């Protein structure tokens, strides 16, 4: 594995990320969610894509793709491991979203190219990274109240907002992926909350990928 080459690719791609608001449709008619997981001891990469109507946030379509994993787990290089399955799921959607939430980092990455940014560049869609853990940077400790907020800073640059979306839950790291500003990323996530820790697009993507009860109930209603 030539990590030096991958690192150089990340730096080059990161220079093409658009950190300004460039939505083709604002407000969006459809918002997507993406989540990646692994099966069979990491041998298979599974990606789930969901499509929600906006502003109702009603689930209208989902796709799951499973492909052979082509790269081992290497911190800082996860997007190279995850994007092939994401692309396979994306290509199955009959309707593409106007805005995509990705479970993972955007520019809040040591080389400013998390999976939300990498995938956003690949398909040229506005993306937001919604991560559950810090990858780089520092932030001031948050109060326990829901809504507590702090900028994630690295080398004098704001990479994300750290936001406690729900009481007694760890905060989310919300960042530009591509074609969405940092402040707008936070605002869009806040518009897509329904009382859970995660915004609806990535919550549904996780539910579909993992076969959670909410998704099972949704399937039963559709029959």
Swiss-Prot record:
EC numbers on record: 3.1.21.7
Keyword Nucleus part of the UniProt annotation: no
Intrachain S-S bonds: none
Reactions catalysed, as given in the entry: Endonucleolytic cleavage at apurinic or apyrimidinic sites to products with a 5'-phosphate
Cofactor(s) annotated in UniProt: Mg(2+)
Subcellular location as annotated: Cytoplasm
Domain of life: Bacteria
UniProt-listed InterPro entries: Endonuclease-V (IPR007581)
Feature type site, description Interaction with target DNA: 73
GO terms under biological process: DNA repair
Example GO molecular function: RNA endonuclease activity, producing 5'-phosphomonoesters
NCBIfam families from the UniProt entry: PRK11617.1
This protein's name: Endonuclease V
Organism listed in the record: Salmonella typhimurium (strain LT2 / SGSC1412 / ATCC 700720)
UniProt gene name: nfi
């Amino acid at each position: 594995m030539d990590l030096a080459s991958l690192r150089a690719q990340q730096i080059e791609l990161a220079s093409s990320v658009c950190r300004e608001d460039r939505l083709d449709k604002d407000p969006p008619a459809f918002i997507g969610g993406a989540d990646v997981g692994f099966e069979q001891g990491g041998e298979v990469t599974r990606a789930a894509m969901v499509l929600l109507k906006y502003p109702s946030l009603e689930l209208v379509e989902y796709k799951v793709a499973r492909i052979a994993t082509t790269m081992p787990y290497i911190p800082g290089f996860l997007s190279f491991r995850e994007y092939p399955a994401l692309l396979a799921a994306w290509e199955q959607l009959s309707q593409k979203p106007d805005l995509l939430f990705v479970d993972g980092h955007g520019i809040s990455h040591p080389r400013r190219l998390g999976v939300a940014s990498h995938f956003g560049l690949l398909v040229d869609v506005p993306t937001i990274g919604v991560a559950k853990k810090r990858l780089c940077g520092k932030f001031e400790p948050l109060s326990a109240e829901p809504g507590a907020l702090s900028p994630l800073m690295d080398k004098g640059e704001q990479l994300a907002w750290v936001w406690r979306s729900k009481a007694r839950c760890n905060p989310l790291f919300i960042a530009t992926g591509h074609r969405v500003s940092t402040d707008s990323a936070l605002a869009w996530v806040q518009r897509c909350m329904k009382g859970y820790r995660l915004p609806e697009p990535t919550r549904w993507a996780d539910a579909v990928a993992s076969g959670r009860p909410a998704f099972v109930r949704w399937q039963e209603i559709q029959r």
